[in-house]
Every structure is written in structure tokens, then in C-alpha cells.
Amino acid sequence: MKLEKQSEKNIKGLVLTLRPDNAQKLLLDKHLNDTRFIYNQYVEEYLKAIKENRFPEYKDYKELRAEHEFLKDSYAWTLQQVLYRFKQTNKINRSKRSKGQKVGLVKFRSKKSHSDYFYTRAVKLSYNLDCKSKSYVYIPKIGNVKFLCKNIKSEFLNGKIKTCTVKRTKTGVYKISLLIEVNKVYEERVDNNHIGLDFSLRDFFVDSFGAKAPEFSTKRSKLESFQKKIDSLNTLISKMRNKSKNKRKVSVKMYRKTIKRNKLYERVHNVQIDYINKLSRYLCKHNELIALENLNLAEMSERTSYNDPETSSKGGNHGKSIGLLQWSYFLNKLEQNAEKFGNIIVYVDKYFPSSQICSKCGERHSEMKDVTNRTLECKCGNIIDRDYNSAINLLKFSEFVVYNKSYQTLEKGLSEYKAFKCLDFSRSKALKLQSEIWL
């Protein structure tokens, strides 16, 4: 059952694959090159100002248009947004430097790296349910561009387009991402279970019921097969670069191999995103309370002294494996779906010893600080997997925080720790008034 509230608005994203003709492709590429040219002009002025120890004096897009006639064919709002976004990135970098973070200077953009430009208005979406071939997106200075039709939800068609970004992928495919203001839509949960999740490099996560992430082994085998193909293509490309007698023939072969490799990268990304979207929705639909550990993913990916028997490499950097799992994206999608289904998400403090405390008697085992110990053996007779035990303790602690449930197994050191963040999206009060203000 879906409930739609008129007063509250929400901004959602819609990504469409464009199908432009040859003339429209040239215009899209011209906009990309013009925005890249203006961006490089601002980078040059910024670096000069740093060397001369002065404030940068940026030219407006109108002045640049007067100096360079080829910029007059591009849409004015896209050129204006380049300066705005450039200033915003510098502002963010300054705030990071003030906090002590290491941030490098801005760099020039090449044709390979620069792949998107921005619209703020005048973009229109026309979708014909009866004849999908007549569906198009109107883009200023480009015209009506057809897109790869899929079943678009009615909330997107009735919403208001706020901003738009046109992007060219590394495989040469043009995509448009729209930010649309729509009415908030709430859905009802199927079950009201409570669950704790402990992340794992091998199984994605282990929950408080002892189950692992569903169908993750098949997804992981598919990703590994893609990764082997990518590695073989990378070796071929590197050999072509080193042994280049006939440069023209080699460049054509290299281009084909790089396109093939980039398509595999996109397939890997699509498999990951699709799995995480379905998994996060399933968890929020069947659980009321979700307990998680607040992980510092940036620190975990940089650690080189992490010896984990779950993975094949020992003592190496696990940044690649953590990046493949995409835990940060999973947490973002979990919060988005929790707002839709009205869940409660508790992030437990990362210093809480969830893997050291026995979930049955509460005795603390300091030997479990060593990550190589995968099973906890307690004097009470409890022999349990490390991740399963940690998930149970995370759930018990979160129930103590939210519902004030007392557990004797956690009373010894419970006062020392606190929940890092508790997100309550429950709508118990709002649902009582649905007959008055809800459709």
C-alpha cells in the first residue's frame, strides 16, 4: 500500500540513456568541449593567482564569449554553471584544508577525463505510453533527443525537473540524469522484525539470525569472472603500448580493447548497484529496526597491516575489495529506503566490542581482538562464529538504546559506550492522521 502526501516534497534522480543522431552527437560533444575549455581557463587563472600571491580574477562567461566566438553556439546557462561549480569545489577544498585534510590543487581537464556538463532549466521530458518511439527529452541548443525507453514511474512524469546533467561515458554512450521534485511516497512494511548486521569481506554481511547476504556468492563469482577478463585486457593494452612498431594499426586495436574493457567496467558497476538496491529494499521492507556498526571505511581501505583469513591476500591493502563491496552506497540506499518504509536505523559506536563479548553469558574475551580468530569459544559452552556473535550483540545494544530493554549479558560494560547515530524514520503519529491529510 502506497501513501502519497501532497505537502511534503522529495527530490529523486532519474537516469536515461540517450539515443542521439549524428548531428546531435556533434552538438553534445561541442558543449562538452566548450565547458572543458572554460574550466581550464579558470584553472589557469587560479594557479597564476597562487604563484603571484593574489586573489584570482575570474572572467564572466560573457567576456569569454566576446573573446572566443566558438563559445556563442553553446547554451549560456551551461557556461555560467562552470564558474559556479568551480568556486564551489574550491570552497569545499578550503574547508577540508582548514580541518587538516590533505587536498591537492585543481588540475586541467583533458578530453578523456571531462565527460559531463550541467543544465539548470528549460529541460523537458515527454513520455508517450502508447508509442514509446515518440518519447524524447528536450535539451536546449540540442533539440528533441530520443532515449532508451523503459517503464518510467508516473511520479517522475508529474514532477518538476530541477536540474539536469548530460554525461558521456567511457564507452561513448550518452546519458542524462534528471533531478525531479516529486511528492513523498510511503510504503507499508511486510514484517516488523529486528535485525543486526555485521559486515564481512567474504559474505557482505552476517545478520543476527545467522544468515548471510542472500545470493551474494553468485554475484561475487560473476564479479570475479568480469575482473579476470578486465585484468587480461589490461595486460594486452599495456603490451600494445610498449611494443608499438606500426603505431596506426596498434592505436586502432588499442581503442577497440579499451572500449571492450570499459564496457566490462560498466557491467561490474551495474551488477553491484542492482544487487545493493534490491538488498536494501528487502531489508527495510521486512524489518523495523536495523542495527549496524559505524565503520570508518576510508581508514579500513588504507590499512596495510590487516591480516584476514577470509581473503586470499595476507597483509595487503584491502581497498579494492572494500570498493567492490560498496558498503557506503549500501548505507546510503538503506537510509533512503528506511525513510520510505519508516524504519529505525542505529549506528553503534565503532569502539563497542561486539565481537569480544559472548552473546550468551556476557563474558569478554580479549583474545578476539585478533582478527584471525574466527570462532568464539566461551566457558559457558557457547561456540559461535565471530560475525554471528557480533551481529547479535549489535542488535541487543540497539534495542537497549531504542526500547530500553535490559540485557544481563551487556550490563557489565554498557555504560561506557553509546550509539553513534540513531535515525528514526517511524511514522506512528503521521499514520493516525492519514484520513485527514493523506490521499
Task: Kindly give the residue locations of the regions a language model identified.
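Gly/serine-rich nucleotide phosphate-binding loop at the start of the catalytic core
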Residues: M1-Q81
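Positively charged, helix-rich recognition surfaces that bind polyanionic ligands
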Residues: E4, K12, K170-L439
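Generic detection of short hydrophobic beta-strand segments and adjacent strand-loop junctions
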Residues: L14-L18, V145-K150, A213-F216
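Alpha-helix initiation and N-capping motif
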Residues: K25, R36, N40-V43, R54-Y61, ...
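Long, hydrophobic, amphipathic alpha-helical segments used as structural scaffolds
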Residues: V43-I50, N90, R94-Q101, N294
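Acidic carboxylate diad motif detector
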Residues: Y58-T169, L324
